[in-house]
């Protein structure tokens, strides 16, 4: 999933140059990602792409099958190969969600240790999600509500975001469901101005 990663700095979006120093089969364990625009570099250590932030070494608690099914349904992950981002405590369900939906999942700032698989990758970041614009089908922000604004950039038009019921969304989202735990919104995509010709 390295091809989806982008420099989190504020400049024109571009791919990152990757140099790997240690791999296990197809999994990158150690290496560096470099930005060709601003020359920033980001380490890959222990299989985690580190753009800032940290990842806990604690083991993930068991997530109930009902909770995984609920997240999959709220994110509308019906197509195998869809891309979902699970943030913070939501990332505990990354492996189970990937198995259930056959989706690719990025565990962003997980609250516990997540093992990478063919469809699950771990990324640590601070205030900007280091993914390509309009590349994600769904994102569950959990306790990473500060990333809601940037979620609008990475979601495809019609992509869904699930957040705690206390969250508020910028105008780039349209709320579609709410219960006592969560609120679900849909990305409306970029607005295109229409001009009449004279």
PLM region spans:
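Beta-strand-connecting loops/turns
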Residues: 81-82, 134, 157-159
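A short glycine-rich, Lys/Arg-flanked "PGG" loop and its adjoining helix->strand segment in the class I
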Residues: 145-170
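Hydrophobic beta-strand segment of the Class I
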Residues: 134-142
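N-terminal auxiliary segments of SAM/dcSAM-dependent transferases
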Residues: 1-66, 75-76, 198
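Core SAM-dependent methyltransferase catalytic element
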Residues: 171-198
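Conserved alpha-helix/loop element of class I SAM-dependent methyltransferases that forms part
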Residues: 51-52, 58-99
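A generic alpha-to-beta junction signature in SAM-dependent methyltransferases
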Residues: 78, 101, 153-156
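Class I SAM-dependent methyltransferase SAM/SAH-binding core
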Residues: 80-131
């Amino acid at each position: 999933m390295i091809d989806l990663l982008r420099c989190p700095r504020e400049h024109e979006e571009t791919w990152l140059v990757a140099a790997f120093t240690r791999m296990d089969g197809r999994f990158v364990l150690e290496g560096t990602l470099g930005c060709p625009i601003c020359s920033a570099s980001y380490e890959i250590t222990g299989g985690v792409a580190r753009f800032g932030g940290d990842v806990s070494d604690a083991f993930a608690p068991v997530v109930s099958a009902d909770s995984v099914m609920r997240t999959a349904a709220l994110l509308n992950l019906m197509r195998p190969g869809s891309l979902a981002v699970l943030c913070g405590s939501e990332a505990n369900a990354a492996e189970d969600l990937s198995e259930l939906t056959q989706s690719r999942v990025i565990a962003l700032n997980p609250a516990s240790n997540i093992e990478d698989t063919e469809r699950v990758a771990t990324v640590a970041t601070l205030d900007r999600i280091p993914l390509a614009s309009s590349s994600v089908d769904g994102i569950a922000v959990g306790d990473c509500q500060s990333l809601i604004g940037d979620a609008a950039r990475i979601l495809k038009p019609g992509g869904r975001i699930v957040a705690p019921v206390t969250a508020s969304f910028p105008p780039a989202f349209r709320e579609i469901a709410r219960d006592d735990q969560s609120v679900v919104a849909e990305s409306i995509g970029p607005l295109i101005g229409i001009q009449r010709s004279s």
